[in-house]
């Protein structure tokens, strides 16, 4: 398996002007062990296709680092100090995965 750092994927996704904030988590996958899921809030709740976000990130990331799915939320939860709440993101992703 390849080592994927969530922060690297998040940084690439945030370069998309429509992406306001995001967190990346791994969820179980039968084929690869884990699949990358991004929980994304958009600038001013804009509507964008998840395929557009993924293809924009493709310019900055190797294929195996790209999220397999984008799950949209109104706000990405963070602690008062701005620290990412990965536990919330993982639960949110599990509850909203297609």
Kindly give the residue locations of the regions a language model identified.
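AMP-binding/adenylate-forming catalytic core of the ANL superfamily
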Residues: 1-65, 91
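Alpha-helix boundary/capping detector
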Residues: 39-40, 79, 83, 96
């Amino acid at each position: 398996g390849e080592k994927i750092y969530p922060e690297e994927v998040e940084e690439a996704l945030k370069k998309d002007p429509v992406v306001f904030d995001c967190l990346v988590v791994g969820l179980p996958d039968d084929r690869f062990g884990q699949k990358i899921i991004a929980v994304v809030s958009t600038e001013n709740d804009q509507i964008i296709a998840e395929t557009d976000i993924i293809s924009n990130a493709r310019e900055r990331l190797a294929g195996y680092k790209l999220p397999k799915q984008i799950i949209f939320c109104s706000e990405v939860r963070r602690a008062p100090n701005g620290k990412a709440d990965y536990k919330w993101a993982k639960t949110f992703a599990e509850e909203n995965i297609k």
